[in-house]
């Protein structure tokens, strides 16, 4: 059986949630060889130790705390985790067996359960975020030309090929993880919040020929600490951050890798329609005080994103497609 070690990124702000996660890891039927906690520099290390976990200080950032060489780990696989999930006792063992059976490079747990949203929430997600359900099972999550995604509507318990995935928990073959060079995506950490970091990372594996899959109903609980995302959602600048991140991410992962000029035009039209639609919705919502500045900030974000894609810094980033 493939061996694995655990890599957790954290700021240490939710120690009890982290404790619950560590307890569930130490209780696994197949034990991890190591549990490495990548703690952002300048943040206090939790005072407790559940078992044999080790702490490594790294630069702060959603991407930076994943874009490490993992020199501390010699296992076949790395279980990448946020600090707010917990597992049933045989969860990791089952996913390792899935990885061996399907010869996958990465299997991510479905932690956000889009398919379980209420009908009202599904309609809202489709209208506001262009995120909609799909009724075939070809892909767990499919990325579209406008950089939005669709999700399988009724997966049941199973494991499906995917173009993207949720970021809180994923089992990677170490060779595939290192080959993705997440350090090339550190531009995301320069935003107020690394909006869409999981999408840019998982889709990169898919676009570069890796086999990504998503496991549904395989014994994971999302404890949802929201230490970083909570700050983002409370920020008045979130609309600007979202627009800027979406613009850069679309340009990097959709537009630039497209060799066909006709397809590039269609992708541009698709993305432009999405952004104009979102702007129109924000304009209607701006009658509320909390959304008063949203349209202006959204436009500023698009402009900032377009400006960045023309910068020398952006042009110096290695290509998204690496082969």
Predicted regions located by residue number:
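Glycine-rich, basic loop-to-helix element that forms the pyrophosphate-binding segment
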Residues: 57-73
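Conserved nucleotide-sugar donor-binding
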Residues: 75, 166-181
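Acidic donor-binding loop at a coil-to-helix junction in glycosyltransferase catalytic cores
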Residues: 165-167, 188-203
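A recurrent flexible, glycine/aromatic-enriched loop bordering the glycosyltransferase active site
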Residues: 139-172, 193-194, 229
């Amino acid at each position: 059986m493939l061996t694995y070690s655990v890599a957790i990124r954290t700021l240490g702000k939710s120690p009890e949630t982290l404790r619950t996660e560590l307890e569930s890891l130490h209780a696994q039927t197949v034990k991890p060889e190591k549990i490495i906690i990548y703690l952002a520099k300048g943040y206090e290390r939790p005072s407790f130790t559940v078992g044999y976990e080790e702490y490594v200080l790294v630069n702060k950032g959603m991407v930076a705390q994943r874009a490490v060489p993992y020199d501390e780990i010699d296992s076949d696989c790395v279980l990448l985790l946020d600090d707010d999930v917990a597992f049933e006792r045989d969860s990791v063992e089952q996913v390792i067996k899935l990885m061996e059976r399907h010869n996958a490079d990465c299997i991510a747990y479905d932690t956000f359960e889009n398919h379980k949203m209420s009908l009202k929430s599904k309609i809202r997600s489709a209208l506001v975020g262009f995120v909609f359900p799909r009724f075939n099972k070809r892909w767990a999550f499919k990325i579209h030309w406008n950089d939005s995604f669709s999700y399988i509507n009724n997966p049941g318990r199973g494991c499906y090929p995917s173009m993207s995935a949720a970021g809180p928990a994923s089992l990677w073959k170490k060779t595939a993880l290192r080959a993705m060079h997440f350090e090339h995506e550190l531009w995301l950490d320069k935003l107020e919040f690394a909006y869409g970091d999981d999408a840019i990372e998982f889709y990169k594996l898919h676009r570069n020929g890796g086999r990504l899959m998503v496991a549904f109903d395989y014994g994971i609980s999302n404890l949802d600490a929201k230490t970083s995302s909570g700050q983002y959602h409370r920020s008045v600048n979130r609309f600007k951050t979202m627009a800027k991140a979406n613009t850069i991410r679309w340009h990097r992962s959709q537009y630039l890798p497209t060799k066909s000029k006709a397809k590039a035009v269609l992708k541009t039209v698709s993305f432009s329609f999405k952004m104009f639609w979102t702007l129109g919705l924000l304009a209607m919502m701006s009658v509320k005080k909390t959304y008063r500045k949203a349209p202006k900030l959204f436009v500023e974000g698009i402009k900032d994103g377009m400006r960045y894609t023309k910068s020398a810094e952006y042009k110096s980033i290695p290509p998204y497609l690496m082969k």
